[in-house]
Amino acid sequence: MTDQQTQPKLEIRVIPTTPLQQNTSMIWSIETMEGVFVDPGGDIDKLMGAAEEFGVKIVGVWLTHGHMDHAGAAKAVKDRTGAEIIGPHKDDQWLLDEIESSGKRYGITDGQNVTPDRYLEDGDELELDGVTFGVAHCPGHTPGHVVIYNESGALAFVGDVLFRGSVGRTDFPRGNHQQLIDSITSKLWPLGTDIRFVPGHGPMSTFGQERADNPFVADAVTGYQGAQKSEANEIDQKLAKRWS
């Protein structure tokens, strides 16, 4: 994932969960075989089956925000594994308290309300077997949304902030469209155009690609000034070296 000469390699698998096909990521060290789930929204048996298939011991749950399709299985993972639940920002606790009630509206009945062991703040760091991940508070979709990223590994887990060709909804309670756009341009774009991201739903993309043609946050739309995106083959070469 990062510089292979100085840091352990990490593996990642993206596992769609819930009827909403939310992307849960499982990240683990191939040296210790310890790993974390990012945004375990539901389908606990499917998630634990994936961990068993790859021989991963789940030691943590990292949440980008409090919506039930991203956090609904966090408590179940902790109950089964003892994993520490980290994130999101404290401003999303009200959503974590409504997982069960909101799930009923979408026919998702296995979610559980949850309180994290630790909230995240802008600038915090997370670690998995010596590999450091940064945290950016990116409100807009929800007030307590965070993005978790590894800059040297050129990868980010953006939850529902950004998608291929779109951005997160802001018509939910306490959503704010302008705040969302500001979060993307001020917190994500400076990380670099070669950052590849796992969105909450749908396919992966790069920040450079979205700056080029996303109808909501392309540079031509926002007027953002910054480095232009790397050529696609350069991005692929970097990713091939960093993620194996």
Model regions: which residues?
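Short, conserved catalytic or adaptor-binding loops enriched in Gly and charged residues
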Residues: T2-Q7, D110-G111
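Conserved beta-strand hairpin/beta-sheet module of binuclear metal-dependent hydrolase folds
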Residues: Q5-F54, V147-G159
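Hydrophobic/aromatic beta-strand patches that form the interior of the parallel beta-sheet core
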Residues: R13, W62, I86, R118-L120, ...
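Active-site HxH/HxHxD metal-binding segment of metal-dependent hydrolases
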Residues: Q21, T32-G35, G42-E127, V131, ...
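Conserved S/T- and glycine-rich ATP-binding loop of Class I adenylate-forming
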Residues: I27, T64, C138
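Metallo-beta-lactamase
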Residues: M33, S101-K104, E125, V131-W243
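Aromatic/hydrophobic pocket-lining residues that form the small-molecule binding cavity
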Residues: P40, A71, L180-I184
